[in-house]
Amino acid sequence: MMADPGDPTSSMKGHHPLIVVIKLGTSSIVDEKTHEPILSILTLIVETAVRLRKDGHKVIIVSSGAIGVGLRRMDVEKRPKHLSKLQALAAIGQCRLMSLWDSLFEHLRQPISQILLTRNDISDRTRYRNAQNTILELLEMGVIPIVNENDTLAVAEIKFGDNDTLSAIIAAMAHANFLFLMTDVDCLYDKNPRTHPDAQPIEEVEDISAIRADVSSAGSSLGTGGMGTKIVAARLATSAGVTTVITRSSLPGNIVKIVRYLQARKKHNSPVGDSEAEDPLSRSTASLSLDAVEKPPLHTRFLPLPQPIRDRYFWILHGLAPHGTIYIDAGAHRALVGKAGLLPVGVLDVEGNFAQQESVRLVVVERRSEPGPDGKLWEGPGIEVGRALVNYGTPEIIRIRGHRSREIETILGYADSEYVADRENVSLLLKESRPVTPVLEMVNESGGSTVA
């Protein structure tokens, strides 16, 4: 039986808890060659999660590995390419994986639950809210939810593609404070330390848009995610106000050290007299001081946006797959920024075939004074500024674009709304003016580098 990692003297119960999401890839918990679960890592993850719970925090684990464990259970050497075989192995492996998690957590008397999601569960607003409410209720009950994509039901066209993206959505859904993306690297560097002895680790990334992610950096033979997907996940999570951390998966105990350090650092840097009522990170660390906390191991943290996009607006931006594009002029964009709806007069063109209440991209383009050689009243390619749920489908918007709202009924024979999209159904991307982060590189265990 594992030793109880809880230390009553360090318990922070009674303080406002933080919500910590830990994402584990297949390569972190399943041996790439033998396909055996790496029990030593699983055990350390369990001890880390329970330690966080004893510190008063709430924990969610997003765990891959079902297919990898299924390969071992059925003595299959290589990951198959056919979807039906992958789905079958996922069904087999998920049972075994959850059995392992439950057995390990049971030693420390920590209840867990299983949540399996597909992209369709996220794109449907009612199911999204149901999943959100279930997760929040489980956290209130002191349960650790273990989340995975439902690979048995998901098909290629609607898969998340990797659990990095899923973990970011879960973190946003739960209003988490931290998302830990566990990987085979310690952190980001300002240059490749293998070729530049003066390379320095990057502790904080403020402007994630300045990072050039090498999406060609593939995952392991068992997994689907590489470094590019982690940068995408960090972008999603930080936009929802979640501090995102990349750190080494083989040392999960680092999570506790990093959380405690960041808690103490936040408290230390808070101006005297600041109200802690609005800052759970400060409230949860009343008993910590910066001097008393061990300096954390190497990691890179991506800072959250100061004005996060949450709940319905996050769901519109990141939970839905867009079915088309609406090209708008600068005046329409200014109106949207000013909290007005999207009027047809500001619509220049439409692309794609979408229906009423489906999601579309909003792209700002330059309006021409007269049609160009291509017959268009605009020139692009333009800049995507957000997403919207539309009140009219493609055929209707093509007919009413450029017209005043009072003309809609005359043109269509009816007028469901004066707006192409109501303002509450528009979610705009935020453009942050933040310090530029230098070109970053990630170094993996084998010594290779990945430009980020």
How should these model regions be labeled?
Residues M2-A452:
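C-terminal catalytic "cap/lid" subdomain
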